[in-house]
Curated annotation (Swiss-Prot):
Amino-acid positions noted as binding Mg(2+) in the UniProt annotation, renumbered to this chain: T169, E313
GO biological process: fatty acid metabolic process
Protein name: Fatty acid--[acyl-carrier-protein] ligase MmaC
Enzyme class: ligase
Binding site for ATP: I218, V308, S312, D403
Secretion signal span: none
Gene label: mmaC
Keyword terms of this UniProt record: ATP-binding, Fatty acid metabolism, Ligase, Lipid metabolism, Magnesium, Metal-binding, Nucleotide-binding
UniProt cofactor(s): Mg(2+)
PROSITE patterns membership: AMP_BINDING (PS00455)
Cited InterPro entries: AMP-bd_C (IPR025110), AMP-bd_C_sf (IPR045851), AMP-binding_CS (IPR020845), AMP-dep_synth/lig_dom (IPR000873), ANL_N_sf (IPR042099), ATP-dep_AMP-bd_enzyme (IPR050237)
Amino acid sequence: MSDLPATVLERIIEQAQRRPEAIALRRCDGTSALPYSELAAEVDRYAGALRAQSASRGSRVLVISDNGPETYLAVLACAKLGAIAVMADGNLPPATIDRFCQITDPVAVLIAPGSKVGSSSLPEGLAAIPAIRVDIGSGTGEFAHSPDTDRPATEPGLGADDPLAMIFTSGTTGEPKAVLLANRTFFAVPDILRNEGLNWVTWVDGETTYSPLPATHIGGLWWILTCLMRGGLCITGGENTPSLMQILNSNAVNTTCLVPTLLSKLVSELKSAATTVPSLRLLGYGGSRAIAADVRFIEATGVRTAQVYGLSETGCTALCLPTDDDSIAKIEAGAVGRPYPGVEVYLAADDEADGAGPNAPGAGPSASFGTLWIKSPANMLGYWSNPQRTQEVLIDGWVNTGDLLERHEDGFFYIKGRSSEMIISGGVNIAPDEVDRIAEGVPGVREAACFEIPDPEFGALVGLAVVAATDMDASAARKLKHTIAAHYRRESESVARPSTIVIVSEIPRTQSGKVMRTSLAAAANQVQTGG
């Protein structure tokens, strides 16, 4: 793949040798600052503590995250042993954490200090498992043990294909699945960009980055580990800080990666303050469809942007839409980008809906519209302890994303929704993302999302929930609804026009920003009935 070290930790240790005094990790409020030399020492310390609890290559270690430096330290301590960091948000209900443990069977627990879940409040199922609180510079308490300084950076024989972490998919519905990610997941795409000399997404050695995305989310974990491998100063935390703008300015941040809801928040703050972030060079975004006006505003301040598309299962990003002359027009049309060199994509048409994959007997050439399959060097290893689901989603190295996309002649791909969310009305397939996109092009609409309304005659009708750009009285709300309806009459076929339009205060979304359409339907119904 490259002449660089074959594991994430080895690459970070290489940076520690080059810049030992440089800060590797720090909270956005200035606390928990950890130079690269101390990061390496703390990794040794906690790896020793884990080894004393019988953790070894292939063992699972539950990492209860607070998204701060200690969380990433815990991941790297696992990496030194070849153990697998099982990521769990410290704000999750104990029952959910208990379910994660039933799936992964961890041998130890590492708890970040800002987690709401502590060693005394762990689920009953974890009572017999050693729990270690991760505190920078304080040793390991009752589990203090001689550090692993006499051992190599990682266990001998570990390589790019060895597992590093598990992330549970949030999804919009269904049983949680533990996505098993290899070391290569976190550097395959950056290596491609560097080798190809492409500036779609760029990292500069030693720059300052900030990620508000959780370490339990592929975007958060991937972004911070990638920047650590480039010797960057990684700012973390701040989930409860009211101002993104303040964090970026006070820490002189050069690069950041946001979900579209946070991008909208940042734009709102910058507009209100009539200011910019002078240090900011690059803003990446992804997880759900962005509002083109927000991207246009950021680019007008001189900041380069890059939309990244992918899933936990594809190792974060597989397609990219960087700043170019007509990128805003592409975003307005629903584009999510084009594949990186070395990433293969395939659109399976409706008549290939059996899910057998691009290499199946009888599979035709990639369609212009269909379910997207991705073959990337960053793809997951599979779902932990779930071979049946793995065989359904990962076939011959190809991941079935479940997303419906359309390929245009310019080589860019445009998202239309998820195959599982397709609304079928009178036998016609309606792509939810296309309905959403049309509504968000109406002046006065901040965001919008459609949902399914059961109907005895057509099977289903389209409902639309809208968040207005400003507060409005009943008369203004009626006027906005009429404007939206008129826009659909001009822009869409009749079957895809909303039969009901509801003004709501917010669109329910997953942690990664994806619309929770079932919850949205319930919320819209409650608004209509006055519940």
